[in-house]
């Protein structure tokens, strides 16, 4: 069973009441959605996912709790559009868990894992055209270097990109992993897995994860009611920087206004940052994937 990271902290900080209207932007295997649903007997839950396998599994799990939910088969970049289509224009709480779910990592045929052999894929939405195979085999060397640096913060981006271009076509995850290993120093291989950052970078490129998240988060802030909260669990610094920047942007008073003796209400920030939470030691001991997790929480105040 997939273990949701920071589950208790996330649910307890949503400030749910019996009749809350809640959006889970990342349904996955319903770890968060199922706990939310238990706490809103008179409310409603909207859960987004573009992975049909996840939707099928989670629908059964949620149906065993109660029926006041709707699963929306869409990327959360369409958050506002899809909710508006259902005549939903404001909600009490919105949550994101940006980690790749354990089943996606563990199911070899999805091509996310550098430990298991599979065709290069990495698509969250299995209906889209762009996949990891196309990135690895069709992108220019310059574009590969760019995404490895920007999305993987990989210091050996140039040598890895050269190795990929010189060994095309590359079909499977383990082929790619071996090429990465061959193009980094031996000492680097003894640290964390040498393919980790490159696989992250390719996955982000395939799914346009950073742009999609930024657009969606602004929509979430527009949708949440006064007193409502938006929560984001991130697993790497790229996502966390975006979240931190946007939360600071909407919660900080403009420098010029700080000089005023009294700041008019309409010029004060609409949000306040509530907390930044990292996993406790016992969760880190139980779930290795929690190591890099961070939960950021913001609340609408006007």
Model regions and ranges:
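S-adenosyl-L-methionine-dependent methyltransferase catalytic core, i.e., the SAM/SAH-binding region
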Residues: 1-302
């Amino acid at each position: 069973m997939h273990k949701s990271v920071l589950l208790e902290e996330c649910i307890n900080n949503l400030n749910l009441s019996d009749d809350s209207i809640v959006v889970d932007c990342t349904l996955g295997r319903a770890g968060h959605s199922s706990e939310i649903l238990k706490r809103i007997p008179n409310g409603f839950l909207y859960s987004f996912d573009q992975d049909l396998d996840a939707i099928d599994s989670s629908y059964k799990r949620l149906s065993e709790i109660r029926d006041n939910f709707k699963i929306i088969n869409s990327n959360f970049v369409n958050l506002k559009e899809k909710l508006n289509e259902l005549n939903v224009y404001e909600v009490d709480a919105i949550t994101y868990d940006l980690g790749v779910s354990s089943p996606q990592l563990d199911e070899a045929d999805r091509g996310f894992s550098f430990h298991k052999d599979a065709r290069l894929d990495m698509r969250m939405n299995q209906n889209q055209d762009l996949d990891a195979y196309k990135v690895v085999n069709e992108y220019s060397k310059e574009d590969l270097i760019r995404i490895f640096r920007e999305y993987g913060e990989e210091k050996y981006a140039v040598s890895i990109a050269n190795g990929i271009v010189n060994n095309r076509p590359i079909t499977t995850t383990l082929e790619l992993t071996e090429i990465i290993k061959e193009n980094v120093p031996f000492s680097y291989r003894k640290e964390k897995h040498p393919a980790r950052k490159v696989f992250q970078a390719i996955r982000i490129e395939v799914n346009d994860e950073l742009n999609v998240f930024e657009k969606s988060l602004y929509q979430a802030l527009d949708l949440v009611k006064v007193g409502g909260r938006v929560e984001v669990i991130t697993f790497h610094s790229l996502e966390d920087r975006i979240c931190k920047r946007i939360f600071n942007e909407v919660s900080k008073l403009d420098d010029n206004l700080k000089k005023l003796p009294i700041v008019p209400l309409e010029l004060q920030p609409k949000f306040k940052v509530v907390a930044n939470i990292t996993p406790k030691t016992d969760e880190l001991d139980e779930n290795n994937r929690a190591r890099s997790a961070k939960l950021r929480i913001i609340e609408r105040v006007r």
